[in-house]
A protein has these predicted regions:
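Short recognition patches in nucleic-acid-associated and regulatory proteins
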Residues: 128-152
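A broad, low-specificity signal marking well-ordered, structured residues that form hydrophobic/aromatic
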Residues: 6, 59, 156-157
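Short glycine-aromatic motifs
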Residues: 74-76, 141-146, 171-172, 176
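Short, hydrophobic/glycine-enriched beta-strand segments
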Residues: 4-12, 131
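Short, Lys/Arg-enriched, disordered terminal segments
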Residues: 1-3, 177-179
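Small side chains
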Residues: 98, 137-140, 166, 171
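Acidic/glycine-enriched connector segments
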Residues: 2-3, 14-127
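Short metal-binding segments enriched for Cys and/or His
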Residues: 155-177
Length: 179
């Protein structure tokens, strides 16, 4: 694995990767970072498809069963444990950074963001917001604009608000997600 490892996770309900997530993946690939991804349907498979189509090979599919449920030809590692949350916890401990593609409701993805003790970029699946979460800073949950001002489409929100909770867990709980 490269020195920098990215834990990519997301909601199972998501059917396509938002443009902002694709841009983040392109930057990750350009820097040659190792990507850890799970073996579930939804975002895990979408991520694998995108990386496979790009010919990117610095990918490890993590799983708890004897074989991954979904693997599009990448290296894989069986993680000790019997629950999918064991796999998520392993990836959270192993990664330096995280990328989450979140539907805004999935408690599993929210918990994955909270597990990471480092920076996480969370892209909202409706492609309207991008959230920078940094559990080690004083600002634990910051909304940053998804795009630069888009005069041709005033419906694209540019949102700068933050919860000064100091911890991602508290910020997620403000949104009704228990970690």
């Amino acid at each position: 694995m490269s020195k920098t490892t990215i834990f990519v996770s997301g909601s199972r309900s998501i059917k396509f990767l938002p443009q902002r997530a694709l841009q983040a993946l392109d930057r990750i690939m350009a820097q040659g970072f190792t990507i850890l991804v799970g073996d579930c349907f939804g975002v895990d498979v979408l991520i694998q498809r995108y990386l496979s189509a790009k010919g990117y090979r610095q990918v490890t599919v993590c799983h708890i069963n004897a074989r991954p449920r979904h693997n599009l030809g990448f290296n894989s590692t069986q993680v000790p444990g019997t629950r999918q949350t064991d796999k998520d916890a392993y990836m959270g401990r192993t990664a330096n950074f995280g990328l989450a593609i979140w539907d805004g409701a999935s408690p599993g993805t929210a918990k994955n963001m909270a597990r990471l003790k480092t920076k996480v970029i969370a892209v909202n699946s409706n492609d309207t917001t991008c959230i920078l979460c940094n559990t080690t800073s004083e600002i634990g949950f910051v909304r940053i604009p998804l795009t630069f001002h888009e005069p041709s489409n005033p419906k694209i929100p540019t949102c700068y608000s933050c919860y000064e909770s100091g911890k991602l867990k508290q910020a997620l709980e403000l949104r009704g997600i228990k970690c």
